[in-house]
From Swiss-Prot:
Gene name per UniProt: APS4
Organelle targeting peptide span: 1-51
EC number(s) given by UniProt: 2.7.7.4
Subunit structure: Homotetramer.
NCBIfam families: sopT
Known function: Sulfate adenylyltransferase. Catalyzes the first step of the sulfate assimilation pathway.
Protein name: ATP sulfurylase 4, chloroplastic
GO CC entries: chloroplast; chloroplast stroma; mitochondrion; plastid
Taxonomic superkingdom: Eukaryota
Localization in the cell: Plastid, Chloroplast stroma
Length: 469
């Protein structure tokens, strides 16, 4: 697996158009994490974004949540639809992603034409001939019995684990689920042990069902973290309110160490040098399914709060918001999805580290992907031409300075690369990393998490909240 060394910009990316500047942007108390007052959910299914922010894919930000005035009627309709599909946790996370427009211009689970284009081209073509990036299938699997029960129906109701209606899927299309090909093309291997494939594909049904989604209510988790779950439309409102003239996004699924912070703060410095006046960081931790040895979201968010409280990142120029997508660990294929979703959230700059969305090979002692392929693929990916992918160099722990710094190959003996495995081992033993690797209060959260494992679960993983409407 890739080490926890970070990556940092070293060259000038293509410069995009400036964003609207709001001279009345609010200020934030130092040392506190930014929690914004959210606007009302946008009620139209297709919101034409006319602000100075980068336009979402397809020019419209999809909002698939039913208008509040129509929810009672639609809930009644959902109860009367005879065909029902029970959603699992990952299915619900994809409903959340789709409902808020992260996957715009998708209007629901993929039909076969969208699925095939995604699988073979990592993109699909719109009616006007333009191409948008889409590298991971967003699909809903059903089994033979469910397909039989649906019959000739044109719509189905999607329900949660206890039968509560979540959404209606309209104008449906059912087609074969080519599991082996899907796994091979998404991960580049069919080896056993791929976390997402084991969770959501290999045991799933032999059919896929696509259609247009009508989500009955905004998806909530009621886990104390919903205040951090800003939709793309809400994030865009916040960036305008802050007067951002550039938005740079950082995706992560791990605790923030000082190498990450160096990456983010130096990126802002370089954007200021380029002439931007108020670049804003979107720190966008992944909030959906993750593999068993990743730190759960609730603990990561506690750690992120400490990072801002300790001033490692500036809360006045940082927006912390949860990205609701499941994690596929599909390397260069998946990192395109991560980048595309941030366009829809308003980001025009995207930072990548080493081995983005990567993991160790499930059956061999090596990394599954080349650590540099993610950044290279992003610079060439169809449909991502509008997004500025920042070139970078590696950062590691500089023993001579006692802090994370940019790696200097001329004195490589002075640098220490602390892998994720090494970091977890230290935390489990309640040992401290080298001074300057992570802020002490953030490290304590990590130690407390590993200390809590046996007490809270006995199976090595703290349970996570499940979405509900």
């Amino acid at each position: 697996m890739a080490s926890s060394a970070a990556a940092i910009v070293s060259g000038s990316p293509f410069r995009s158009s400036p964003l609207i500047h709001n001279h009345h942007a609010s200020r934030y108390a130092p040392g506190s994490i930014s929690v914004v007052s959210l606007p009302r959910q946008v009620s139209r299914r297709g919101l034409s974004v006319k602000s100075g922010l980068i336009e979402p894919d397809g020019g419209k930000l999809m909002n698939l949540v039913v208008e509040e005035s129509r929810r009672r009627v639609m809930k009644h309709e959902a109860e009367t639809v005879p065909a029902r599909i029970k959603l699992n946790r990952v299915d619900l996370e994809w409903v959340h992603v789709l409902s808020e427009g992260w996957a715009s211009p998708l209007k629901g689970f993929m039909r076969q034409s969208e699925f095939l284009q995604t699988l073979h081209f990592n993109s699909f073509r719109l009616e006007d001939g333009s191409v948008v990036n889409m590298s991971v299938p967003i699909v809903l699997a059903i089994d033979d019995d469910q397909k039989f029960r649906i019959g000739d129906s044109n719509q189905v109701t999607l329900v949660d684990s206890v039968g509560n209606p979540i959404a209606i899927l309209n104008d449906i299309e059912i087609y074969k689920h080519p599991k082996e090909e899907r796994i091979a093309r998404t991960w580049g291997t069919t080896a056993r042990g791929l976390p997402y494939a084991e969770e959501a594909i290999t045991k799933a049904g032999n059919w896929l069902i696509g259609g247009d989604l009508q989500v009955l209510e905004p998806i909530k988790y009621n886990d104390g973290l919903d205040r951090f779950r800003l939709s793309p439309s809400q994030l865009r409102e916040e960036f305008i309110r802050r007067g951002a003239d550039a938005v740079f996004a950082f995706q992560l699924r791990n605790p923030v160490h000082n190498g990450h912070a160096l990456l983010m703060t130096d990126t802002r410095r370089r954007l200021l040098e380029m002439g931007y006046k108020n670049p804003v960081l979107l720190l966008n931790p992944l909030g959906g399914f993750t593999k068993a040895d990743d730190v759960p979201l609730s603990w990561r968010m506690r750690q992120h709060e400490k990072v801002l409280e300790d001033g490692v990142l500036d809360p006045e120029t940082t927006v912390v918001s949860i990205f609701p997508s499941p994690m596929l660990y599909a390397g260069p294929t998946e990192v395109q999805w991560h980048a595309k979703a941030r366009i829809n959230a308003g980001a025009n700059f995207y930072i990548v580290g080493r081995d983005p969305a990567g993991m160790g090979h499930p059956t061999e002692k090596r990394d599954l992907y080349d650590a540099d392929h993610g950044k290279k693929v992003l610079s060439m990916a169809p449909g991502l031409e509008r997004l500025n992918i920042l070139p970078f160099k590696v950062a590691a722990y500089d023993k001579t300075q006692g802090k994370m710094a940019f790696f200097d190959p001329s004195r490589s003996q002075d640098f220490l690369f602390i892998s994720g495995t090494k970091m977890r081992g230290l935390a489990k033993k309640k040992e401290n990393p080298p001074d300057g690797f992570m802020c002490p209060s953030g490290w304590k959260v990590l130690v407390d998490y590993y200390d809590s494992l046996s007490a809270e679960t006995g199976n090595g993983r703290v349970s996570e909240a499940v979405a509900s409407a």
